[in-house]
């Protein structure tokens, strides 16, 4: 039997680590938490210092027995749970179950699953950090208080099955507030005018925008004002009033935190935050990379720090110099500042070895794992490269009291942009403007027609922008962003409309009720301040009991007041036009964990339910039935026939009513990352099978 037992959280991690350590070590997984507050009762003794009443989690008895047996046989037990508050608390519970002294050197911590990092951690075991455990327990107890005392209020006043949470309700409020802003937004009309100028008939033309009149910002509010401005500019003499030419540097972005990784994965890869964290977990816990065996490819993925270790920056600088050239290596290490309250003991998310390029590991990764790893690898390498340098030219031009501005930028040195692919650089359009001395007269080549615009409302939140908002407001921590969004989606408080997150009537009803009676608790400043207090507990700067008392006393008074004053309201019910075939009632729309479905309002007498068939207005090419949008268990959209199972037609791509001009086969629709829709033929025998149709080509494709 091995002399040493190492306990981690997941079996994937245990398999990877056991290969590093050899015969003298056995590695076992706790499978997450082993003890927790009971689900059936409140489980917190408020009258006795908020003592939690932990129990072993149901279904984990056999695992606990196995871990106890392994611990008794081992000379030394090392607790190697994740390097954050949740991991520290799991470690503390493990110590209790196994009879270990938390004050003994039983805890090891590493931020990457590589042989070097794990073996180095074993050389420096430490005590369990009881302050971090207190911080986690405080958060858990407050969330239990809110969940177990506020949720029943919603059951009594609205309907059973609803829930409220300290962070999730604030997240829903943020989305509801944005929806109100959008609904109340009044567009304002404005116009812009651009002049196309040149020095002489042989010189290149360039565009200049009208920005001022008589030294004040020009505001053109209607067509009449635009026409008047155009008339003046057509007759004006143009002259360069001021010319400026300088270099402008564009610095690389810092390495990824949890938040910035989730945001970029949504925008660039169209991954949900949940999917991003699942893939990141797989890359962190270990992937078999051939002869090298299983190894963690990235560092710990729950972090709000942008710090890189000295070893990592040295490796990056060496790699950049040998791969791209010395001219791409900055004189000193690029250092980035972490945000306030960041846990800077952690590193940013980075590859565990820059030498494991995306190309080198591609054959060992799934398609989505590779996409995410490439994103992380490129961002990390770029953050230690030199800035890109542009030559920027700015001209201020006078014309009959009007001032126009022409600006251009040309890339002089690509720097970190060397890592950008063609699609990324497509947004980096260069615009050349000639440098002309002051008082140079110019010719009006063409006055472009005035353009009408309207101010736009603030955009709907997406998963990416909501994560950014939560982080900027100090709400939650890296580990909570993704679960929070998933919870409010599952509860039906918000829905996804494409990429947009939109509040539902139910979400608005709950937010309005709770913010009316709990406005001092269900708000952004309070939630953010509580996160700061949890940080202070972890740093031994605040007391757990004091924080809990300061929260519970006002909360309990508000709860009593709300219970007396809130009138019972009916949750909004949307009636469908579908009749229940079992009892004849008109079925209603219900929100479940996996989206909307139809249910009979006669429940529990009638328990009939059925999925909502979302027709796309296209007939099945095989049988003539209706094509409907469906979803897999993992929420991926596909298209099938309403006559299933008689008709087995399915497609990942969206069928259309248009047909290939060459073979007459149905055309399918794809949407690229930029939201552009393209049509293509899938007939393998057609010479245009791989051709895409867009714009006029799509319009010319045959229809039935």
Model-derived features: where do they sit?
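Intrinsically disordered, low-complexity regulatory segments
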Residues: 1-140, 149, 211, 227, ...
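Conserved short loop/turn motifs at secondary-structure junctions
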Residues: 2, 82-83, 159-163, 245-254, ...
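Basic, low-complexity terminal or inter-domain segments flanking catalytic cores
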Residues: 2-4, 16, 25, 151, ...
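C-terminal or mid-to-C-terminal helical accessory/interaction module adjacent to the motor/catalytic core
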Residues: 113-195, 246
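Core structural elements
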Residues: 139-149, 167, 197-199, 248-260, ...
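C-terminal accessory/connector segments of nucleic-acid motor ATPases
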Residues: 185-208, 239-279, 598
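Metal- or metallocofactor-binding catalytic centers and their adjacent structured scaffolds
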Residues: 217-254
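Short acidic, hydrophobic short linear motifs in intrinsically disordered regions
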Residues: 240-243, 252-265, 292-301, 457-469
